[in-house]
Amino acid sequence: MVTIGTPKSATATKVVLCGSGELGKEFVIELQRYGVEVIALDKYPDAPAMQVAHRSYVVSMLDGDALREIIEKEKPDYIVPEVEAIATRTLMELEEEGYHVIPTARATWLTMNREGIRRLAAEELGLPTSPYRFAETEEEFKEAVKVIGMPCVVKPIMSSSGHGQSVVREEKDIDRAWQYAQEGGRAGAGKVIVEGFVDFDYEITQLTVRHIGGTSFLEPVGHVQVDGDYRESWQPQAMSLAAKAKAREIAGKITEALGGRGIFGVELFIKGDDVIFSEVSPRPHDTGMVTMITQDLSQFALHARAVLGLPIPNIVFHGAGASRAVVVEGDSDRLSLGNLDKVLEQPDTQMRFFGKPEVHGHRRMAVLLARGLDVTEAREKTGVMMEQLNVKL
């Protein structure tokens, strides 16, 4: 029997959220609907999820001692990582001491670095993947590029959203790719993965939720990425029945191997009826923001239910929808978005302004959402919304 107490009282059900970005913000809002007391952590103040949590701490999630100090002080019922860069050894110790890490500390550890999850997928589970080699030194890296061949993709094993990722197309790109990967890793310089190019028609995110009633699969999400970072997504992605079945089979295998409860974003390449595993995140996925307008229970609502041990008897899909990221370029700590009366004048449109305190360089600051008769119409709507949006730095 699931029981939730009163926030900020002795009976409170408490969640510590490790990472407070825009995905965490929506998750916190869903937890608040159930009366859960939320403590949000991030490395900078006034992060999006902090703005809707009961309280917050500014801390590096890679600082295991600082993380432990907060956990021991707050004594949460659940520890929910929202970022890859986190002190996984500390999480594993805390789990052994009786704390509940979502989905599990092992899943967080495996997916924090591309080596752990790639070896699990390809070598233990036998899932189809791109050819790959790992390299720890520049010499090993150059040898890996030689073995894999060009063009190839180079990524730090610990990074996300395209940080440190580049494509080696010819000899002159090799040195630059190594340096960029060393500078772009979330946890500093280190090992990289060199991946062979995959010939694919399109890529999808197969959102998969593990809950007390079993495993549920959402309609496939198609997306566009620029330099490894999400720019646009839509649901459902049109695909053959055979490919759809294989996508769910692969997603089921990898999420079962990771274990625990919660939402997983399984990234896959599709070529005809063939499906190739790419990556998995054991948390809400940026491309999955489209579910805020396409489903009765968004990926964030599903994650909240799964974490709390609440049932998910069904998921209602309202119809085709699209999301478009608002990526701002410049320097500002007083960003404003204008002309919103025009942006939202089309039927079946929504937006989320994340409220990030500042931008330096490129930063995703909002998302535009639309439903349509089909995916094409929904994407066109978000395109019109973007044209109408007035960004002021």
Swiss-Prot record:
Record: residues binding N(1)-(5-phospho-beta-D-ribosyl)glycinamide: 22-23, 82, 286, 356, 363-364
Give the enzyme's EC designation.
Answer: 6.3.1.21
What pathway does this protein act in?
Purine metabolism; IMP biosynthesis via de novo pathway; N(2)-formyl-N(1)-(5-phospho-D-ribosyl)glycinamide from N(1)-(5-phospho-D-ribosyl)glycinamide (formate route): step 1/1
Q: Where is the ATP-grasp domain?
A: 119-308
One of the GO BP terms on file = 'de novo' IMP biosynthetic process
Q: Which UniProt keywords apply?
A: ATP-binding, Ligase, Magnesium, Metal-binding, Nucleotide-binding, Purine biosynthesis
What class does this enzyme belong to in the EC scheme? ligase
Q: Does the keyword Ligase apply?
A: yes
Residues binding ATP are 114, 155, 160-165, 195-198, 203
Quickly give the catalysed reaction. N(1)-(5-phospho-beta-D-ribosyl)glycinamide + formate + ATP = N(2)-formyl-N(1)-(5-phospho-beta-D-ribosyl)glycinamide + ADP + phosphate + H(+)
Matching entries from Gene3D superfamilies are given as:
3.40.50.20, ATP-grasp fold, A domain, ATP-grasp fold, B domain
Short name of any one Pfam family annotated for the protein: RS_preATP-grasp-like
> Care to name a GO molecular-function term for this sequence?
phosphoribosylglycinamide formyltransferase activity
Recorded GO CC terms? cytosol
- List, alphabetically, the PROSITE patterns matched: ATP_GRASP
Keyword Transport assigned: no
Record-annotated residues binding Mg(2+)? 267, 279
Function, as annotated: Involved in the de novo purine biosynthesis. Catalyzes the transfer of formate to 5-phospho-ribosyl-glycinamide (GAR), producing 5-phospho-ribosyl-N-formylglycinamide (FGAR). Formate is provided by PurU via hydrolysis of 10-formyl-tetrahydrofolate.
Q: How does it assemble?
A: Homodimer.
Belongs to which family? Answer: Belongs to the PurK/PurT family.
This protein is called Formate-dependent phosphoribosylglycinamide formyltransferase
**Gene name of this polypeptide:** purT
